[in-house]
């Protein structure tokens, strides 16, 4: 596909997503895939347009075939497992097993971390931990209307910028496809939500964004700090999940069970409206993403001090909301 035709991708993804949502709202009414009377069609409206947009790119251009095929097929598998989970509520072990299967398929097609300082086996292990962590982080983040989709959109935009700056056509294609679908989804998912994302959507989002981070270009040898770029772009879901796990372990509860320990829920308990919480989460994600983009370009290792300061601020905010939530 010629570069000057890339603008077609987000429009294709957007309008196909709109069609799927409108048809899905009608089709899933009074059927199994509903929650509180609201259809769980968000995953389909994000996953299918992204997949078909990728297939179109493969049809018109063979230069991205290997890695794009790997991400498309493995993310489709993750989406299918998510639909099954939405319908039958898989056990934790079954979820981890299905996610591992999708990750294996991805790695077998050549998509993994390629950190030059370590060998192949450590890179594969890091890939597993990274993708399974981000996939479940977005699943945990899907606790409020518009939240997971909004955070994903900001992170996707940041990945688009890194891909554009580095001339990474694969990342550009993926972010354009995902961005178009996310815009249409958010129109129907902002509070009060008319559709839900479901596990199929949150797992797909986390998986694609995590995979996108792997195929992006960050760190030539002269810019080692750029390795932190994807960690910052996805900083909010990572931090939220890490603190969630720490809190639950301290309270001797399973990290995998649903609870109200999330940062967004604590803001809600403190009296913030849902729209104000979304604004706060948007700003946090935007700041983290901006820092990630800055780190991808700096040469001076002293910039690590900036990283530590931001981490300290983020930790302080979460601890403060944690104490406020406990008092409420």
Per-region residue spans from a language model:
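"…together with the soluble PPM/PP2C metallo-phosphatase catalytic core" -> "…together
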Residues: 2-242
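Cytosolic, membrane-interface loops and tails of multi-pass inner-membrane proteins
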Residues: 22-39, 243-275
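Alpha-helical transmembrane segments of integral membrane proteins
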Residues: 261, 268-291, 296
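Extended hydrophobic-aromatic, low-complexity segments
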Residues: 222-224, 245, 256-258, 276, ...
